[in-house]
């Protein structure tokens, strides 16, 4: 499974002005959906995405789009794992946020790769065991 982070969804669904090229992440996301790849969205990411919209129409548009993705909700064990991630990162001097630790925990517990543009997750990967979805570089998960 591939879990989507807010950074990817925000850029992919951002309205573009005429002639503006499609962001690479939007094209990759479209290819993942077309290939019927298992793609999910953490519940907290859905909340973050929808909390940033300005109009009820945009809220409804994004809600409709997001219904096409599996919703990944946190369980008790995910919260415990998130706390362990925060502690492991703190011991290494890596700053984290509670939300980012929960997103990482959800990816780890579902054996999913996290598709993100947020560099904080790259710093968290080694101490947490988080797998990041790669969009270039020749690996098997590349798109």
What label would you give each PLM region?
Residues 70-117, 143:
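Active-site neighborhoods of divalent-metal-dependent phosphate/nucleic-acid chemistry enzymes
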Residues 1-41, 51-64, 134-143:
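Short, well-structured N-terminal submotif of metal-dependent ribonuclease cores
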Residues 35-36, 65-69, 92, 110, ...:
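Structured helix-beta-strand junction loops
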Residues 25-26, 46, 59-62, 79-82, ...:
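A general structural signal for well-ordered alpha-helical segments in protein cores
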Residues 5-6, 49, 82, 107:
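Generic structural signal for small/hydrophobic residues in well-ordered secondary structure
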């Amino acid at each position: 499974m591939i879990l989507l982070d807010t950074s990817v969804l925000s850029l992919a669904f951002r309205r573009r002005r005429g002639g503006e090229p499609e962001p690479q992440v939007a094209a990759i996301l479209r290819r993942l959906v077309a290939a019927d790849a298992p793609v999910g969205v953490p519940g907290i990411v859905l909340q973050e995405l929808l909390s940033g919209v300005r109009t009820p129409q945009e809220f409804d548009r994004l809600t409709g789009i997001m219904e096409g993705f599996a919703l990944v909700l946190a369980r008790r064990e995910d919260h415990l794992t998130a706390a362990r991630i925060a502690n492991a990162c703190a011991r290494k001097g890596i700053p984290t946020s509670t939300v980012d630790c929960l997103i990482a925990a959800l990816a780890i517990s579902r054996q999913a790769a996290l598709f993100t543009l947020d560099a904080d997750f790259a710093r968290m990967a080694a101490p947490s065991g988080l797998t990041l979805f790669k969009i270039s570089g020749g690996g098997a998960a590349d798109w």
